């Protein structure tokens, strides 16, 4: 990837190269390419201004990711059993427009709602779409050109990861996603995720990089 980026003559060229050669989403239309490149252009414009820092030097991109992770971690321990998860649901429901016009109930499954609520709290809804359903959220990521299904990809802190618990482990995991979380840390072949609705609470889980249950 780095070699491809170094030879690119523009943000658009670099974005298109990564999209077509590495991410390879089903939808590689011009609309998707333009939208994907616009995110890179935004950061390029920001970090090439005088006095700005690059993401690798601790600029806003890395700060946004860490803030997203830290915000999620601050809710660890919230549970459905004592009603403390209601504040998470409320954050989601107070954001407009509601995805598909649906107001989440306190008794609904709330893993995608949790991720969405953290994005709302951090002001990241332009790059992390809000949804209360995992499958629908994946569709929105695909529409934004942000969906990553490359087995060689190593998760980064702040990434949103989806699982299909019913996958057999034979072939690529393409089943319906059951759950979603936020990547907190990576250590060798494993990574730690913060999840909402993990046994009806916000908690941490350790996953294997490119494990059979990873949907994307």
Segments (PLM) and residue ranges:
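N-terminal capping segments
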Residues: 53-124
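Soluble non-cytosolic domains of exported or imported proteins
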Residues: 8-12, 30-34, 62-66, 105-113, ...
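Residues within well-formed alpha-helices
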Residues: 13-14, 35, 39, 71, ...
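Non-catalytic cell-wall polysaccharide-engagement segments
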Residues: 2-65, 211-216
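Aromatic- and glycine-rich peptidoglycan recognition patches
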Residues: 45-49, 53-63, 67-70, 77, ...
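Sec-exported extracytoplasmic/periplasmic mature domains
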Residues: 1, 19-24, 45-49, 73-81, ...
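...with weaker cross-activation on analogous glycine-rich loops/strands in unrelated enzymes
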Residues: 6, 125-200
